[in-house]
Structures are given as structure tokens and as C-alpha cells.
Amino acid sequence: MAPRDIAQLGSADALGALGRGFESCYPDIMELNRRYFGKTIVFCLPGSHYSGRFLVRFTQLLLDCRQIGINTIISQDYSSMVNYARCKVMGANVTRGKYQVPFGGAIEYDYMMWIDSDIAFTSADFFKLLEQDRDIVSGWYIQPGGLTPIVEKMDDEYFKSHGYFEFISEDAMSKRNSLFKADYVGFGWVLIKRGVFESISYPWFAPKLIKIGEDLEDVCSEDVSFCIDAKNAGYDIWVDPKIRVGHEKVLTI
């Protein structure tokens, strides 16, 4: 067997804060309890397997939610087709038609928190998203190559010159301090309020054929497709540059 290790793409804060304790980041537990007691979060976990590291982080997050009175629901599923996997996580059923709602309306919830299986996070990272009180809000992480999965503006002219949209670099993101709007965010670490998916027709993550100018066409991924539909439905997509999580990748050496 070839030796393997985990390459963790992320800041020391995102990857090392697990042992510091939830209370050290949020000393006023009673204030969090006052704001969010009785709220219900559906944690959406698409994927086929999860590391021991993920299990420890996620278990701690569930315990911290319970400590302040947040109800939690876990929805997990998998398909080799990522767009279908995400719809399965939301309890979709093609026989319900294009106007169906998540989980067939059987689950009352306030937020969906989407977490990919290779994200390294802390409870504090989650509660910082929650406190932004936005319909759609994301943190950020690094992809192999040093870019984030975030496009602030899907500029057609840039696409014509490069063959892809301009992703924000790690360096550029690290220099930002304020919440900002984006045209596209990856779905590895994003919080979405109830009402957003309910206002978008099924299938919520169907890849789209997009046209760039007169003669360029491309097929966008499932998360790009959702972002396009959400913006067309009138929702802003927000990014908090102060919420950086880690990104684990398996490395053969």
C-alpha cells in the first residue's frame, strides 16, 4: 500500500481551533440561546464517506447546537452525479414535479447548512455564518491551485479571454474584511434560509447550458446553476471573508 497523508488547505485557525472550546469563541452562551433557541437546522451532507476528523468536528457542532437549544436534523445521501446527490439530500422525488418543496414539505426547518465531506471547520465557523442573518451566506476555502471557489462577478468578457470566470485568489480574499455579494459560491460551506429553495423550481441543481456572447457555450456545474437560479429569484449571495474553513485533500507521496 502506498503511503498516504491528508493535505489540509486552510488556515491554522480553521484547522486548529477544534480543541480550544466553543465557549472561548462564544463566551455568552445565554445570548446565543436567546437568539436561536428553538430554531431548526438541517445539516445537508452529500457524500459517500467522512473522515474521523470530520466526525469529531461535526459531533462537536451538534453538541454545541444542543447546548444553546437549536434543533438539528441530518440529511445525508450520495450519488455519483453531484447534482442528483444534492437533490437526494433535500428529499427530492421526481414524481412530485417541478414545484415540489424540500423534503416534500414534511420537515419544518429554519436553515439548511451545506457541508462537504472534505471541509475542516469549527462550531465557531458555523455560528459566525448564522449571525450574518442572510438568505444565502458562505465562508470560503482554498481549492488546489490557490484559488477560492468564489466568483464575485461572472464577467462575460473575462470568460471570452480565459475560458472560465475569474475566481477570487487566496491572497485577494485574505485582504478583505467586509461581507460582500458574489455571483457564485461553491457549496462546500454555505448556509441557506428556509424560503430560498421553496421559491426555485425543481430540479434545484440541474446543470445549465450557458451562452457567452454570440458563439461561446459551456455547461455549468450544479452549484453555479443554483446560484444563477437564486439570483434570478431575487436573492443576494453573500460571502464573509472572515470565515475561512479548511479543505482536506488526500495526497499520495
Where are these regions (language model features)?
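Catalytic donor-sugar/metal-binding loop of nucleotide-sugar-dependent glycosyltransferases
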Residues: K181, R194, S199-A206, K211-H247, ...
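Short, positively charged low-complexity motifs
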Residues: M1-P3, Q8, G21
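Residue-level detector of anion-binding/catalytic polar loops
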Residues: N71, D118, D135, D236, ...
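Short, conserved alpha-helix that lines the donor NDP-sugar binding/gating region
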Residues: V82-G105, I228
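Short beta-strand-to-loop acidic/aromatic patch adjacent to the donor-nucleotide binding site
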Residues: K98-A120
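N-proximal low-complexity "stem/linker" segments adjacent to membrane-targeting elements
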Residues: M30-M81
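Conserved catalytic core of nucleotide-sugar-dependent glycosyltransferases
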Residues: M90, T122-L209
